[in-house]
Amino acid sequence: MKLTDKIRRVYLPMTETGFYILFCLQKEGHGYSITQKVKDMTDSQVLIGPGTMDGTLSKMEKDGLISFVREEEKRKIYRITDLGHKILDIELKRIERLYRNSREEG
């Protein structure tokens, strides 16, 4: 899939949930493993509920940001796609710019 205007409008800037899901899926994973990793990475400050996780994974898969790899013990394993990497890279650059600007002004 291509980085269309629609994809840009929907995903940029990213929600915190969307960002962490794409970030975690740089390595294959399932919803629960992502939830636990995000909880650990953020010292429990970001908690993604199962409904939010399932809905976001489903939408991202439909939009081509992630792809289903296989099923293990009734859990769907996903990974980020090239389009997902593009979105994540754009968002990381935006966050870096925000940080840089805050340092220059502060």
Q: Which residues are covered by each model-predicted region?
A:
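N-terminal helix-turn-helix DNA-binding core of bacterial DNA-binding proteins
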Residues: R8-T52
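Amphipathic alpha-helical dimerization/coiled-coil segments
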Residues: K86-G106
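Intrinsically disordered, low-complexity serine/threonine- and proline-rich regulatory segments
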Residues: M1-P13, E96-L98
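Basic, amphipathic "hinge/linker" alpha-helix immediately C-terminal to the N-terminal HTH DNA-binding motif
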Residues: E73-E91
